[in-house]
UniProtKB/Swiss-Prot annotation:
All residue ranges annotated as the GT23 domain in the record: 206-493
Source lineage: Eukaryota, Metazoa, Chordata, Craniata, Vertebrata
Protein name, UniProt field: Alpha-(1,6)-fucosyltransferase
GO BP terms, alphabetized: GDP-L-fucose metabolic process; N-glycan fucosylation; protein N-linked glycosylation; protein N-linked glycosylation via asparagine
Catalysed reaction, written as an equation: N(4)-{beta-D-GlcNAc-(1->2)-alpha-D-Man-(1->3)-[beta-D-GlcNAc-(1->2)-alpha-D-Man-(1->6)]-beta-D-Man-(1->4)-beta-D-GlcNAc-(1->4)-beta-D-GlcNAc}-L-asparaginyl-[protein] + GDP-beta-L-fucose = an N(4)-{beta-D-GlcNAc-(1->2)-alpha-D-Man-(1->3)-[beta-D-GlcNAc-(1->2)-alpha-D-Man-(1->6)]-beta-D-Man-(1->4)-beta-D-GlcNAc-(1->4)-[alpha-L-Fuc-(1->6)]-beta-D-GlcNAc}-L-asparaginyl-[protein] + GDP + H(+)
Main location: Golgi
GO MF, one example: alpha-(1->6)-fucosyltransferase activity
Tissue-level expression: Highest expression in brain.
Gene it is expressed from: FUT8
Length: 575
């Protein structure tokens, strides 16, 4: 039997050796930065891996602390298992460090450099093509002008798809695709652990709670977003979300009859003190806080979208094109875990409809939205983007059939679509369209229909819809939880993505701009631009917050401003 003292020294020796290796490889990376033959992309990848090694070092430190017992044998029981786990992690870490040292010497891979040069050349050739074709158009008239313009747009589409395909393959080279898969999975598991920990306190009678009533006066997508908003505030204020859903207008039995409960251990909203939301600080000593709808919450908490957690921001920016949407998707993912009967319904519907890939999801919202919140869009506007998406997919996979999942509240649309586009295979359930009508909307059958529509839309390879629709935005959010980065897998005919009642959506100017027309606004690098909308023509609308002027500006001259907030990190969730 070895005494603990010797083992503890052994642990400390391992940690010291670990730290020395980290210091060595860190210095090695810094020195290598001076060599011109190393790309900044490769260096960023390696530094990120080094950051993960540091995180593993912290994990080892915590493991060593958990092993620190005053006396007694360690060759059996839990302590022995932890020591063995420590040894395994140490050996893996040594192997990883050696691999990363080799990568810094080798530089980017051959495929990476071939693709990078192909994209560079493609961009140049596109510019040459544009210059040449526009000069030709100047000298054409009438039918000849129309014919040449059509050919020009068709060729331009080929150029764009060629560059986009090269960019896709570039994103997969040198292990980048595998890294992205793993990093997205790790981030998702981390957040889901934290949410699960918060939602399942050991003693419900003592837990701080945030009460959210689901029955906001709107449809399913809107109500789901209302609960997501509540959930984010609960997460930020370290309160267990208590969801009140009795007599829900879609299912009188409540949320739990359709989806899994938001908590397994704490479904009772009672507490020693109760009050309405008056701000995180003022509510500090109130056990149960009732939250109003986002439109009337005051003071506004900092945890509203489009902000993301400070401790995850750097990792999210690297792995995902729209971190704010990814963050929303994590709460949606937790909330819509189906009950067994619903899971079975989804499986049966998948087989019955013949849903399989490749497939484009199309959502056409009509009825109450048209004229009130959105314009009418004929099916032709959707299929333009559907065809573009299929042509892009065909460059990297076999498209045996052009499948389109059509979700709509207009029962007549399916027949119209099949008549106008016989080369497409439309997958749709017209009974869902009938149940989505205004007279049938708030029924359990309608709820089943909208859940199925959202599920299949989120499963599609691309999504074509109007972001003015909550159903479309929910499908897009779920899509983000299914892929490492599906932020670009959409075409919206109207709005950009937004979350109802959020904090401002801002961008930062990276290039100067002098207006050429009366409707444009000037910009200087560093100016904050508040986004008001996007016309999908290269010129969004926004306000220059420094000048107070509203107008159009070139989208390529700005970048997204990622808003971060100091969310709690719930270290207890990892124990």
């Amino acid at each position: 039997m070895r005494p603990w003292t010797g083992s503890w020294r052994w642990i400390m020796l391992i940690l010291f050796a670990w730290g020395t290796l980290l210091f060595y490889i860190g210095g090695h990376l810094v020195r290598d930065n001076d060599h011109s033959d190393h790309s900044s992309r490769e260096l960023s990848k390696i530094l990120a891996k080094l950051e993960r090694l540091k995180q593993q070092n912290e994990d080892l430190r915590r493991m060593a602390e958990s092993l620190r017992i005053p006396e007694g044998p360690i060759d059996q029981g839990p302590a022995s298992g932890r020591v063995r786990a420590l040894e395994e992690q140490f050996m893996k870490a040594k192997e990883q460090i050696e691999n990363y040292k080799k990568q810094t010497k080798n530089g980017p891979g051959k495929d990476h450099e071939i693709l990078r040069r192909r994209i560079e050349n493609g961009a140049k050739e596109l510019w040459f093509f544009l210059q040449s074709e526009l000069k030709k158009l100047k000298n054409l008239e009438g039918n000849e002008l129309q014919r040449h313009a059509d050919e020009f747009l068709s060729d331009l589409g080929h150029h764009e798809r060629s560059i986009m395909t090269d960019l896709y393959y570039l994103s997969q080279t040198d292990g980048a695709g595998d890294w992205r898969e793993k990093e997205a999975k790790d981030l998702t598991e981390l957040v889901q652990r934290r949410i699960t920990y918060l939602q399942n306190p050991k003693d419900c009678s003592k837990a701080k709670k945030l009460v959210c009533n689901i029955n906001k006066g709107c449809g399913y997508g809107c109500q789901l977003h209302h609960v997501v908003y509540c959930f984010m505030i609960a997460y930020g204020t370290q309160r267990t979300l208590a969801l009140e859903s009795h007599n829900w207008r879609y299912a009188t039995g409540g949320w739990e009859t359709v989806f899994r409960p938001v908590s397994e251990t704490c479904t009772d909203r009672s507490g020693s003190s109760t009050g309405h939301w008056s701000g995180e600080v003022k509510d500090k000593n109130v056990q149960v806080v009732e939250l109003p709808i986002v439109d009337s919450v005051h003071p506004r908490p900092p945890y509203l979208p489009l902000a993301v957690p400070e401790d995850l921001a750097d990792r999210l920016v690297r792995v995902h094109g729209d971190p704010a949407v990814w963050w929303v998707s994590q709460f949606v993912k937790y909330l819509i875990r189906p009950q067994p009967w619903l899971e079975k319904e989804i499986e049966e519907a998948t087989k019955k409809l013949g849903f399989k890939h490749p497939v484009i999801g199309v959502h056409v919202r009509r009825t109450d939205k048209v004229g009130a919140e959105a314009a009418f869009h004929p099916i032709e506007e959707y299929t333009v983007h559907v065809e573009e998406d299929f042509q892009l997919l065909a460059r990297r996979m076999q498209v045996d059939k052009k499948r389109v999942y059509l979700a709509t509240d207009d029962p007549a649309l399916l027949k119209e679509a099949k008549t106008k586009y016989p080369s497409y295979e439309f997958i749709s359930d017209n009974s869902i369209s009938w149940s989505a009508g205004l007279h049938n909307r708030y029924t359990e059958n309608s709820l089943r229909g909208v859940i199925l529509d959202i599920h299949f839309l989120s499963q599609a390879d691309f999504l074509v819809c109007t972001f003015s629709s909550q159903v479309c935005r929910v499908a897009y959010e779920i899509m983000q939880a299914l892929h490492p980065d599906a932020s670009a897998n959409f075409r919206s005919l109207d709005d950009i993505y937004y979350f109802g009642g959020p904090n401002a959506h801002n961008q930062i100017a990276i290039y100067p701009h002098q207006p050429r027309t009366e409707g444009e606004i000037p910009m200087e690098p560093g100016d904050i631009i508040g986004v008001a909308g996007n016309h999908w023509d290269g010129y969004p609308k926004g306000v220059n917050r420094k000048l107070g002027r509203t107008g159009l500006y070139p989208s390529y001259k700005v970048r997204e401003k990622i808003e971060t907030v100091k969310y709690p990190t719930y270290p207890e969730a990892d124990k």
